[in-house]
Curated annotation (Swiss-Prot):
It catalyses: (R)-4'-phosphopantetheine + ATP + H(+) = 3'-dephospho-CoA + diphosphate. It comes from Clostridium perfringens (strain SM101 / Type A). The gene is coaD. It comes from the Bacteria. This is Phosphopantetheine adenylyltransferase. ATP binds at S9, F10, H17, G88, L89, R90, E98, Y123, S124, Y125, I126, S127, S128, S129. Pathway: Cofactor biosynthesis; coenzyme A biosynthesis; CoA from (R)-pantothenate: step 4/5. The lineage of its organism: Bacteria, Bacillati, Bacillota, Clostridia, Eubacteriales.
């Protein structure tokens, strides 16, 4: 059984993330979306909320699970008995960083491979950070995030602005 782990903050999940999850789900027996708990970062959504939002988006896939983790990614991958780390690449800059991380993970666990998946061109400019910035200035975000979470994101933006 081929198990892939797709790690990230997903704050919020984007159409680019979902595209990668869908494509990975067609290539692996099981895909675990691993939501990173980063205590040094104040997210827009709590870890539990991010897991729930992603679960809404991937509910139609029988072979996709969503879990949170903290600590080393490689420890989580081993615990889940996965053999592949899935990483999305939007640019050469992404590759340079992810290549270094893949080498480090390979050194820590040579039985685990890193698979790079190139982002679909129509999503290559989308990032969670950019979406948060657009939303903070009342910009339209529905073209950037899965339809299942547009309302959740809009409600959160309103509450953060103190309008709700």
């Amino acid at each position: 059984m081929r198990v892939g782990v797709y790690p990230g903050s997903f704050d919020p999940i984007t159409k680019g993330h979902l595209d990668l999850i869908e494509r990975a789900a067609s290539k692996f027996d099981k895909v675990i979306v691993a939501v990173l708990i980063n205590i040094n970062k104040k997210g827009m959504f709590s870890i539990e909320e991010r897991v729930n939002l992603i679960e809404k988006c991937v509910a139609k896939y029988n072979n996709v699970e969503v879990k949170s983790f903290n600590g080393l990614l490689i420890d989580f991958v081993r615990k889940e008995k996965a053999d592949v780390i899935i990483k999305g690449l939007r640019s050469v800059t992404d590759f340079e960083y992810e290549f270094q991380m893949a080498l480090m993970n390979r050194e820590l666990a040579n039985e685990v491979e890193t698979v790079f998946m190139v982002t679909s061109p129509n999503y290559s400019y989308i990032s969670s950070s950019a979406i948060k910035q657009v939303a903070s200035f009342s910009g339209e975000i529905k073209n950037f995030v899965p339809k299942e979470i547009v309302e959740d994101l809009e409600e959160r933006i309103i509450s953060l602005r103190g309008e709700g």
